[in-house]
Regions:
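Aromatic- and glycine-enriched pocket-lining scaffold segments that form the walls
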Residues: 16-79, 83-85
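A general structural signal marking secondary-structure boundaries and capping sites
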Residues: 17-18, 68, 99, 125, ...
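Solvent-exposed loop and edge beta-strand segments that line ligand/cofactor-binding
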Residues: 21-34, 72-90, 101, 106-110, ...
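Well-ordered alpha-helical scaffold segments within catalytic/enzyme domains
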Residues: 36-50, 87-105, 141-155, 189-204
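Alpha-helical scaffold segments in carbohydrate-active enzymes
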Residues: 43, 47, 56-70, 94, ...
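Terminal, non-catalytic domain-edge segments
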Residues: 177-216
Length: 216
């Protein structure tokens, strides 16, 4: 626990790229690091950091959002576009889950970014009726982000949940990973989707006195 708090307290001085958000070991821009770091950073600030760096977190998302949509707008690689948008959406909803929702301006800004990223995936022209032309990692990450967004009421359940229920069915039936040779990233993302399918999707408990939002 002490080690976790030490790492959390040093997040605000962790190296950034020229755009202002966390970079990878090769100084490259990498949204996978956002997915790794930002939810942890926000959780630390909510519980132990006094929420002093909330503005830093949203500042990084502002920078990421501007770059992401500038890059994907002109990208002809739809597969790569879908993957990065799906990871970005998952990063946002996981960060929203652990922040104090009463800091409404920041929460709402992140919700706007989240909804825009989900919409952007759906506008890529991919077939999301059965997701047959998605790679498995993107399919799973997008389904996870949408399911969690619906549960947290960041998305309209009636409009979005049905889009990804087929992915849930494939996970439950073992169609996405069926043997020991399946990539570990696919297995871990399938586990995330499964975790959302078994949650109570009708009830939410916002724990104001417990450091943030505790979604059932």
């Amino acid at each position: 626990e002490i080690g976790v708090r030490l790492v959390g307290s040093e997040m605000c001085i962790r190296d950034r790229n020229e755009a202002g958000y966390f970079k990878d070991a090769d100084d490259k821009k990498c949204l996978c690091k956002a997915y790794s770091y930002e939810p942890f950073y926000m959780a630390y600030e909510t519980k132990d950091g006094g929420k002093e760096q909330y503005n830093d977190v949203i500042g990084q998302y502002n920078a990421m959002n501007d770059e992401l949509f500038a890059d994907t707008k002109y990208s002809s690689d739809t597969t790569a576009k879908v993957k990065v948008l799906s990871v970005y959406a998952a990063s946002l909803i996981d960060t929203m889950e652990v922040m104090d929702q009463m800091i409404y301006e920041i929460y709402r800004k992140m919700q706007d970014y989240f909804k825009a990223s989900v919409k952007a995936v759906l506008e890529t022209g991919r077939d999301y009726d059965d997701f047959d032309d998605f790679d498995e990692e993107s399919e799973l990450m997008f389904a996870y982000a949408v399911l969690k967004g619906c549960r947290m009421k960041a998305l309209h359940t009636e409009k979005y949940e049905g889009i990804v229920l087929g992915v849930c069915d494939k996970v439950m039936a073992g169609e996405i990973f069926t043997d020991d040779d399946t990539d570990k990233n696919v297995v871990s993302k399938a586990a995330l989707v499964y975790s959302e399918t078994v949650r109570n999707r009708e009830y939410q408990d916002y724990g104001r006195g417990k450091g943030g939002a505790l979604w059932s």
